[in-house]
Curated annotation (Swiss-Prot):
Miscellaneous comment: The active site is a redox-active disulfide bond.
Cofactor: FAD
Cystine pairs: C43-C48
Active-site positions on this chain: H426 (proton acceptor)
Disruption phenotype: Mutants are more sensitive to HOCl treatment than wild-type cells.
NADP as UniProt keyword: yes
Induction: Induced by RclR in response to hypochlorous acid (HOCl).
Keywords of this entry: Disulfide bond, FAD, Flavoprotein, NADP, Oxidoreductase, Redox-active center, Stress response
Any one biological process term the GO annotation gives: response to hypochlorite
GO MF terms held by the record: cupric reductase (NADH) activity; flavin adenine dinucleotide binding; NAD(P)H dehydrogenase (quinone) activity; oxidoreductase activity, acting on a sulfur group of donors, NAD(P) as acceptor; oxidoreductase activity, acting on NAD(P)H; protein homodimerization activity
Residues where FAD binds: E33, Q34, S35, N36, A37, M38, Y39, G40, G41, T42, C43
Stated name of the protein: Probable pyridine nucleotide-disulfide oxidoreductase RclA
Family: Belongs to the class-I pyridine nucleotide-disulfide oxidoreductase family.
Length: 441
């Protein structure tokens, strides 16, 4: 049996970064990845990087086939780079195969050339998440039905794309494919569009999408899916929709089943997420879990922060924990992007805080005029007692950069006036924060 000080399951952001750090510290490390098409993890291969590459090219009205080619070039470059960053290092063995726990120190790696058993003093799980496939008759057998990975590898642009699910993944793909020229229909089972956002923000997003030609159908309870005359037929309670391709955008769930974590005494919750404490320990003393597999926020930057927590315990002072995370921002890369940090207005009011809410139309921002995209709105919530920001929603071009400025001021516990009076370059989208916070009375 091959023995290692550290065995890392999954080539994601946390796993690959931890592997390099431990190898540099002199540890003997094995990193197990089930697919050689996934070196670098979800983000590089089937998530952030390919989707945002296509979002960019769609905004430039690049031909779809050429955009797919460029996406593949970007992904292949980064995948190869990530592989060699690890495989070429002393002390690291990259092992291709499907890992399965035998016990809390031993793993069986299933490989075409024969199974391999390895021993790890410490084991780290970073296997990510996978698409949730709802139990709709025909969804797994009908040609033309894709998860996000499959849709990223289409050979030609669908004339009409249906999207099953109106959450953030669905919105991002809807905007992208509408920009490429597809007709897009979102089918959302809920009665409310983007329920985690304030209604004014969600309504703005819906307006932007509809102006792009996207149809949004709420209360769409799909009963079955079939195939007829080279189209996907989506049958719901009151209507039938024919599309050229259908995207399953019903969310993602932790990828743990094939690991058989129970063999190692690792507890999982009802969604299959690995149960961890604030330092990412599982219920097995020598095993940690990082990233999407823990069932938390599914962002690459959270996986990276998970790595920092584990690194600090193994090689540092052991003081870092998930409790240190303050305000986690996120962006939805529709056109223009939505970015948010902190509370919504609804959450702030429910908290009982005495608040002010200010909004600024993007049409009032000079830089937005220069860039010829005046769609959207900026919104901020300020605590009247502390003068601190409780949250912000930015629906505008470049919001994915601006939100990080807001986050840093919030994390530092500084008053909103820091942004009101900050000196920004001109003309820039960031300087609109001067105007937004000047509206606070």
């Amino acid at each position: 049996m091959n023995k290692y000080q550290a065995v890392i399951i999954g080539f994601g952001k946390a796993g690959k970064t931890l592997a390099v750090t431990l190898a540099k510290a002199g540890w003997r490390v094995a990193l197990i990845e089930q697919s050689n098409a996934m070196y670098g993890g979800t983000c590089i291969n089937i998530g952030c990087i390919p989707t945002k590459t296509l979002v960019h090219d769609a905004q430039q009205h690049t031909d779809f086939v050429r955009a797919i080619q460029r996406k593949n070039e970007v992904v292949n470059f980064l995948r190869n780079k990530n592989f060699h960053n690890l495989a070429d290092m002393p002390n690291i063995d990259v092992i291709d195969g499907q890992a399965e726990f035998i016990n809390n120190h031993s793993l069986r790696v299933h490989r075409p050339e024969g199974n391999l058993e390895i021993h790890g003093e410490k084991i780290f799980i970073n296997t990510g998440a996978q698409t949730v496939v709802p139990p709709i008759p025909g969804i797994t057998t009908t040609p033309g039905v894709y998860d996000s990975t499959g849709l990223l590898n289409l050979k030609e642009l669908p004339g009409h794309l249906g999207i099953l699910g109106g959450g953030y993944i669905g919105v991002e793909f809807a905007s992208m494919f509408a920009n490429f020229g597809s007709k897009v229909t979102i089918l959302e089972a809920a009665s409310l569009f983007l329920p985690r956002e304030d209604r004014d923000i969600a309504d703005n997003i819906a307006t932007i999408l509809r102006d792009q030609g996207v149809d949004i159908i709420l209360n769409a309870h799909v009963e079955r899916i079939s195939h007829h005359e080279n189209q996907v037929q989506v049958h719901s309670e009151h209507a039938q929709l024919a599309v050229d391709a259908l995207l399953i955008a019903s969310g993602r769930q932790p990828a743990t089943a094939s690991l058989h974590p129970e063999n190692a005494g690792i507890a999982v919750n009802e969604r299959g997420a690995i149960v961890v404490d604030k330092r990412l320990h599982t219920t097995a003393d020598n095993i940690w879990a990082m990233g999407d597999v823990t069932g938390g926020l599914q962002f690459t930057y959270i996986s990276l922060d998970d790595y920092r927590i584990v690194r600090d315990e193994l090689l540092g002072e052991g003081k870092r924990s998930t409790d240190d995370r303050k305000n986690v921002p996120y962006s939805v890369f529709m056109t223009p992007p939505l970015s948010r940090v902190g509370m919504t207005e609804e959450q702030a009011r429910e908290s009982g805080a005495d608040i002010q809410v200010v909004t600024l139309p993007v049409a009032a921002i000079p830089r937005a005029r220069v860039m010829n995209d005046t769609r959207g709105v900026l919104k901020a919530i300020v605590d009247n007692k502390t003068q601190r920001m409780l949250g912000a929603s930015l629906l505008c071009v470049d919001s994915h950069e601006m939100i990080n400025i807001v986050k840093m001021v919030m994390d530092a516990g500084l008053p909103y006036s820091i942004l009101r009076d900050q000196i920004f370059t001109h003309p820039s989208m960031s300087e609109s924060l001067n105007d937004l916070f000047s509206l606070v009375k």
